């Protein structure tokens, strides 16, 4: 189960259907993403990370650090 996905959604007061609409999937599909029953496509992970302002690692419970990595600027 991806706890961070659920927590971020609930913190914004959104339903699974709201996020499913953002991703253009059915609510049951999004529910399966949160429960870890389905692999989340990378395109959906990118949308979710931008929407929530965090890293994909955080979304997938691979880190407890909410903020995304800082981008290094090219010199």
Across the structure, where does each feature detected by a protein language model lie?
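Hydrophobic side chains within well-formed alpha-helices
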Residues: 1, 5, 55-56
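Short basic helix-loop element that most often maps to the first helix and adjoining turn
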Residues: 3-22, 47, 73-74
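Conserved hydrophobic/aromatic packing and binding residues within compact polymer-binding modules
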Residues: 5, 19-20, 30-33, 59
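Conserved amphipathic alpha-helical interaction elements at protein-protein interfaces in regulatory
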Residues: 7, 11, 51-54, 65
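Short, charged recognition helix plus adjacent turn
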Residues: 60-75
């Amino acid at each position: 189960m991806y706890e961070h996905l659920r927590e971020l959604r609930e913190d914004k007061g959104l339903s699974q259907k709201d996020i499913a609409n953002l991703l253009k999937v059915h609510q049951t599909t999004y529910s399966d993403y949160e429960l870890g029953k389905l692999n989340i496509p990378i395109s959906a992970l990118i949308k979710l990370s931008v929407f929530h302002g965090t890293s994909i690692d955080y979304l997938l419970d691979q880190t407890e650090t909410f903020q995304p990595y800082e981008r290094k600027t090219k010199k």
